């Protein structure tokens, strides 16, 4: 189901096929198993299809980079660990396993799993002594970026806590890490600044002539991870490190402001700590 997807990955699959010494693809769907084998980018043996009693679905791709194409390959293991960990964070209750083959043909294995996704990840980052409890907000919205555009669906999830020992802000969209944020980052900055400022004003926390707080004051003790999904996405560029959807920014800002207002009312002791 590609309703909420980073893309169809057609170009990536094609590029991998043509830059591999070999590539094997195994697909299970609709009661059948399909196999394709490629060597140096060309299919060998055609498509093989057979019935199967297994009910599982999915695709397995196994390939080896072609050393005639990649004359110098040196990718640190930490890169693969980081990629799989991020995928585990935004895909709760799914196990990701990294197996690294050593020179003696033995394997080193690492498992990445977050039962509650971003909420567990925030708790992990904050450590044993966060300033406040981990909060998790989730919701669905539907709207459009412009009047002449079609409506699209948005899923929003945000987990956060406050800490006087660590800070972290991470944004994900359609399971992809947004290194440069974009719309979700703008929404978080606007909503947290607005609601904390409103709390300080309504509870007379400001000193006379004291300037209103800025997000820079807040982020130094904020641990927050957001994971959003949408059926239509506008990326800042082809690297897909930031999204620019106007509606996502607007609906996420409203979503956060509403939930933060309730959080401050229902948790007065934590609100005082934050202030």
Tell where the protein language model's regions lie, with residue ranges:
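GHKL-family ATPase ATP-binding module
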Residues: 4-6, 10, 14-17, 22-275
